[in-house]
Amino acid sequence: MVTLYDVARIAGVSTATVSRVVHGQDKVRDSTRTRVLEVIDQLGYVPDGAAQSLSRRRKNIIGLVCVERQSPRQQYDIESMSLLFYDEILRGVESRIRHHKWSLLITYLEEAGDPDLPRLLSLSGQVDGLLIGEGIVPSEYLARLAKRLPVVVIAGSPAERAADVVTADNRAGSAALLRHLIEDHGSRRLFHVDGPITAPDARERRLALNELLAANPHCQLVGSSQGLFSVASGEEAGEKLLAIWDEARPDAVVCANDQMAIGVLQAFAKAGVAVPEQVAVVGFDDIFPGSLYDPPLTTVHQPMRLLGERACTRLLDRIARPALRPKVELLPTELVLRSSCGCPPGTVTRRPVPPLRAGRSEPSAAPRRRRTPPVSPS
């Protein structure tokens, strides 16, 4: 088994320096830190003897690495995806580990900048396996971790090959929502509030939008705004749209998650824009606050608690059978129709979303025109 002494010897540094690098301490030169990390990667070193523990002294602990996103308007955005999304994930994970009488160790990594590899290496030495949230660790780092211990990515990219992935069928869910706007409400002009560039969920939802626009030439994207999956960034997107309202004038605002959709609704309410009479607003995720807003939010339900359950089950299977080949599990979504899209007040309709045929969004029939045209905000 590779030891801390082996790393120190090959890197040409003291064992104390290796320890400081592994634990993310600051008193190490950048060049030295880089050299030590390269040797750690080359040797496949796992701190704290975790590699031996996997085969001989199982700890019965798994780790969960969550994504922490901070809004530019608030140092601590209490409405961020980190809380509302991961609360349900945690409930699902906890239900499985409690059944197996295991324990859970939780940490948060900030999305900005490179992943904190020393911190992840240190965490890997304390657990039997890792659950990693939604794209916070790039594939090259993920491959390194997966060589050291079992790893499952929650809400990761369906194209991921370095580790197991459990995620919702985001493309199918987004395609169903967009078809509803076009076919049932006559939406032609769409404004998109996108999620973080690094978030696989946002990438899949964006792909569904691009495919739909390509298949439906009568529709057009009149503008877009990059958000952070937070209410504050959604409100900023709404303000951006209001500033170009006369030129953009969309039929519908398509948001990559519910928090941002709520932020857009807040911006519109302040400006006197009536939803859905002047413009439709839709989200994704089906978080509880969306159902309480006025108007209640049309969205796509992704089974967040089930994501946690299935990811935990897969990780425990991989810990027991390390030779399992990585696989991607897509969980089905549900279209949740309320009144923010233009459905009658009081509507609460749920429609299961089938997988996309041939992996692509299907073209729609020519949409009916919206009966009430959008007007400038007061």
Where are these predicted regions, by residue range?
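Periplasmic-binding protein-like
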Residues: 127-133, 189-193, 223-225, 245-257, ...
